[in-house]
């Protein structure tokens, strides 16, 4: 079978790729990409896994659905491509980062530097129709990404899971809390950020947890200028 992901995630998820539900999802996506405007483009669907190999994951920031605007999504939760306006939820993440660690917001939303350090920016659904939020829910992505979450939870080296909002917190049942760290709060969207996201200090809490595990903390400071890397 041809490789779908070009690192150790391929072995972790190989069993899922061989399931009937994944074959059905694949056929659904072939039709969707042929007939609809789908985000991200098909070459970036698995970008979160490509940039953050299974063995390198230290932190997971769970999202729900890719951004559904033009040129936004590139396969990572909350992140947008260079040159695209920073979405409101990410603006609020930057505000909390400044409040928590004194890191001033950058003028882009490209989070590759986080991914490169072991922050898996994973959406539970990996594709979406243009302008139609949640349009690809219930077609099989959730089963695949739930398997990824469980595999990380069971891995020998523990992980910090950052869960923002109800949809992310619903994944707690997949995580062994006796060995992994869960940091949870309201979602950073403008609708809910003031209900417990602001002031939750997820970035410093994550680094404290990593240091307690003997891991190097994340450098959350993003570069001021970026170019897209394939």
From Swiss-Prot:
<protein>
    <recommendedName>
        <fullName>Uracil-DNA glycosylase</fullName>
        <ecNumber>3.2.2.27</ecNumber>
    </recommendedName>
</protein>
<dbReference type="GO" id="GO:0097510">
    <property type="term" value="P:base-excision repair, AP site formation via deaminated base removal"/>
</dbReference>
<feature type="active site" description="Proton acceptor">
    <location>
        <position position="65"/>
    </location>
</feature>
<dbReference type="GO" id="GO:0005737">
    <property type="term" value="C:cytoplasm"/>
</dbReference>
<dbReference type="InterPro" id="IPR036895">
    <property type="entry name" value="Uracil-DNA_glycosylase-like_sf"/>
</dbReference>
<keyword id="KW-0378">Hydrolase</keyword>
<dbReference type="InterPro" id="IPR018085">
    <property type="entry name" value="Ura-DNA_Glyclase_AS"/>
</dbReference>
<comment type="function">
    <text>Excises uracil residues from the DNA which can arise as a result of misincorporation of dUMP residues by DNA polymerase or due to deamination of cytosine.</text>
</comment>
<keyword id="KW-0227">DNA damage</keyword>
<dbReference type="Pfam" id="PF03167">
    <property type="entry name" value="UDG"/>
</dbReference>
<keyword id="KW-0234">DNA repair</keyword>
<keyword id="KW-0963">Cytoplasm</keyword>
<dbReference type="InterPro" id="IPR002043">
    <property type="entry name" value="UDG_fam1"/>
</dbReference>
<dbReference type="InterPro" id="IPR005122">
    <property type="entry name" value="Uracil-DNA_glycosylase-like"/>
</dbReference>
<dbReference type="GO" id="GO:0004844">
    <property type="term" value="F:uracil DNA N-glycosylase activity"/>
</dbReference>
<comment type="similarity">
    <text>Belongs to the uracil-DNA glycosylase (UDG) superfamily. UNG family.</text>
</comment>
